[in-house]
Design a protein with these regions (language model features):
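Bacterial N-terminal signal peptides that target proteins for export
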Residues: 1-7
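Short, well-ordered beta-strand elements
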Residues: 165-178
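Short, solvent-exposed coil/turn segments at beta-strand boundaries
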Residues: 146, 161-167, 230-232, 293-295
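Primary recognition of N-terminal secretory signal peptides and signal-anchoring hydrophobic helices
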Residues: 199-323
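Short, Gly/Ser/Thr-enriched beta-strand-loop segments that form substrate-interacting elements
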Residues: 140-156
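Hydrophobic h-region of N-terminal signal peptides that target proteins for export
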Residues: 11-21
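N-terminal "mature-domain start" segment
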Residues: 22-105, 134-145, 175-204
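A short acidic-to-branched-hydrophobic micro-motif
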Residues: 90-128
Length: 323
């Protein structure tokens, strides 16, 4: 239970933003296990509660984990809108922190996302953490792949990255030896956060992203959900359905698995896995599988080709050509 103190500290910091006597007071309210505050009496980032929730996983999107309220305050999510927005100048930030509990071990998982008014590198960088902590972070991700514009990790339990105006951290708070943690699971969660950042309607990267057009039989599909993550195109599995792919979903509290079938060939993927099972054996994936709005997002080319679908790309246009 005491591991929840990390979230309690976050709540305390949020509380410190309450203006002193004589200034407009911070607005604060609770709803559905969320503690929400808004300091934007003078300035605002223009982000809503829904905008912040869109940057993290839903309460039931991580198999094997449950979004339980903190036993000390009844909250599982803390959202702070427009931090420092009660002052006319200085930094401006909105944040969301959400915690989950592992159903089997009781270990805690926390995802923190912070959105700034300027490129996040002006406020947070690897160097800040390198000199400001007794534990030296290691530059890069667990897999060696480039998550965001800059990333680093601590042991196997924490991954930090920044992208555009956003900083995100995924942290495991273990009740056992940290060496037993799965760093690639932590990283898979982070890739799902980067996907959400890139898809966010408020353009948190500071510029408009070039859309990827997916064509099946010369007709566009999956508009707005097909993007590149560090050079690898990913998309929800449903984008393959127009190519005569049949999807079968098995989702429980502890597992989220989808089987895709086409002409006797099949692919089976699980949420947060780095490999897929096929009718020809297991295949390592270039990017992990992760959930988004009720679907699983996968590396498009690898899955399509395993189902006998040819993939051709020219610029920002990708064509699926069923064989």
């Amino acid at each position: 239970m005491k591991r929840w103190d990390m979230l309690a500290i976050t709540a305390f910091i949020t509380g410190m933003l309450v203006p002193i006597a004589g200034q407009p007071r911070l607005k604060e309210w609770r709803v559905n296990g969320m503690l929400i505050s808004d300091s934007g009496t003078v300035r605002s980032l223009g982000l809503t509660v829904e905008d912040m929730e869109a940057l993290t996983y839903g309460v039931d999107e991580i198999p094997g984990y449950e979004c339980r309220p903190n036993p000390y305050n009844g909250n599982h999510t803390i959202i702070g809108l427009n931090g420092n927005g009660d002052k006319p100048t200085g930094w401006l930030r909105s944040h969301i922190s959400r915690g989950w509990t592992n159903l089997a071990t009781g270990d805690l998982l926390r995802v923190d996302v912070r959105v700034y008014d300027k490129p996040a590198g002006e406020y947070e960088r690897y160097e800040n953490y390198r000199w400001g902590s007794q534990v030296l972070p290691k530059l890069g991700s667990f897999s060696g792949l480039p998550v965001g514009e800059e990333c680093f990790h601590y042991g196997k339990t924490r991954l930090w990255f920044r992208e555009g105006r956003v900083v995100a951290e995924v942290t495991l708070l273990l009740r056992r030896e940290a060496e037993l943690a799965d760093g690639l699971f932590v990283e898979a969660l982070a890739w799902g956060i980067e996907y959400r950042i890139r898809l966010h309607p408020k353009r948190l990267l500071g510029m408009a992203q070039k859309p990827v057009t997916l064509l099946v039989a010369n007709k566009p599909f999956g508009q707005g959900k097909v993007i590149s993550l560090a050079g690898v195109t990913v998309a929800p599995l449903s984008t393959l359905e127009p190519a005569q792919v049949v999807l079968e979903t098995k989702r429980t509290k502890t597992e989220w698995m989808v089987t895709a079938r086409r002409n006797g060939q099949w692919v089976k993927v699980k949420a947060f896995s780095w490999e897929m099972e096929t009718d020809k054996g297991k295949v390592k994936l270039e990017r992990p599988v992760f959930p988004y709005k009720g679907e699983l997002v996968v590396p498009l080319r690898q899955v399509a080709e395993a189902l006998g679908i040819s993939v051709q790309q020219k610029g920002q246009t990708i064509a699926l050509l069923p064989k």
